[in-house]
Amino acid sequence: MAWIPVHGVASVIALSLGCLVPPAPPRPDAPATLPACKVFILAGQSNMEGQGVVARRDDGGDEVAGTLAWIANDPRTASLVAHLRGADGAWASRDDVFTRYAPPGRPARTAPLGIGCTPHRDGNHFGPELALGHVLGDAIDGPVLLVKTAWGGKSLFTDFRPPSSGGMTGPCYAQMVAEVKAALAQAGEEIPALRGRRFELSGFVWYHGWNDGCDPKNAVPEYEQNLVNLVVDLRRDLGTP
């Protein structure tokens, strides 16, 4: 499994399209040739939750620059996001990539990849899963499940603190492990298209760093080792050697 720094200490993407763990035994009704569902963890704080805006207009009714709709409607940039729209111009979803996310204080929700996998209730936001899901879906021969374990304003120093860092294990670390285990156990029932599939934990995406950066005395000096410990402990607790 390759861990590739893509945005300094604040963002590390770890993707491996190969299986990280021995495949779980297939269910009795699963044909032997049915491709396994590749599972990716998307973890972090508010930016991983999803703060991208689909569309917004100013008081004069003009489209606000920088939104997804603005990019899609500008001839200079439309081609960059053309794959996100269907032939009718509506925002499209995929039938081979799915998301699972439990926003703060709410139960987990599963859905085909598309707009709205965020804590916002307005259906007008999206997160990194939207672009990443299309890349993975195009690259992988078989279904993909993106499990989001992201909660805004949380630090690695305290909230996501892994057991190997000593002190009290962070509640977000424990919740992340629990959410991933629940997804692996339940997604086959929650998502009809995945029924009968094997699930292979295949990658980890970490988009994080702001809160720790606000604590240069304590959190910043520990961030590198805490991140190493996070990876090591996740491998152990999720059975990924």
State the predicted function of each range.
Residues 7-18:
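Bacterial N-terminal signal peptides
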